[in-house]
Amino acid sequence: MDWSIREGARVINMSFAGPRDPMMTRAIQVAASRRIAMIAAMGNEGPGAPISYPAADPNVIAVTATDQTGRLFAAASQGTHVTVAAPGVEIILPAPRGGYQISSGTSVAAAHVSGIAALLLERQPDLDPAQLRQILQETARRGATPDPQLGAGVADPVPALNAAVRPTEPGVPMVTAPPVAPVPDTAQAPAPVAPGTDTAQAAPPPAAPRQATVDPGKAEAKD
């Protein structure tokens, strides 16, 4: 974290959780004084676990995980400090030794929100962490029955990016979500997976290359 601060990072993702640590608290205070957005995972210790840091630090955007239906990840740690949720159940990720793996957890969700924060800063570089938090909360998707365990709701990059544009800015195209291809409900693993294991190796076929261009005079991207 000290290295990230020295190198001038605008967003720091903290996909880890544990007890409060004085050295980490000091580093967070330094990062906050330099207007660095910090996003952390709530943790995966379940609803009865003590609150975890750094997510519980007031300077940090705390992220929990949801499944494909928008429901809270069963193993997610809980607390009133959660800011938003993001997809974090059975997500296909790059594997450490190549290929891909399917993984679940609030760490995955935190990285998702860190990516949204980076896009917001690219679109509007003068946003500070408090403004990023506000945009994420105000544009989050809420279910028919709001769930306080999800904070403000599930972070949604499209309305968040549009909210980051000043109304007086000319020539900045708005963002629209492209159609999403259906995802198969099953994936084939190369070897049997033991019960209770939370990751499995998978090798989906590579997608066909695509090119996209953006017409600044219109509101959507075209293939």
Which ranges hold each PLM region?
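Hydrolase catalytic cores
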Residues: 10, 74, 88-155, 162, ...
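Structural detector of well-ordered beta-strand residues that form the stable sheet scaffold
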Residues: 37-40, 61-63, 85, 92
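Structural motif
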Residues: 49, 58-61, 89, 140
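Carbohydrate-associated surface elements
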Residues: 66
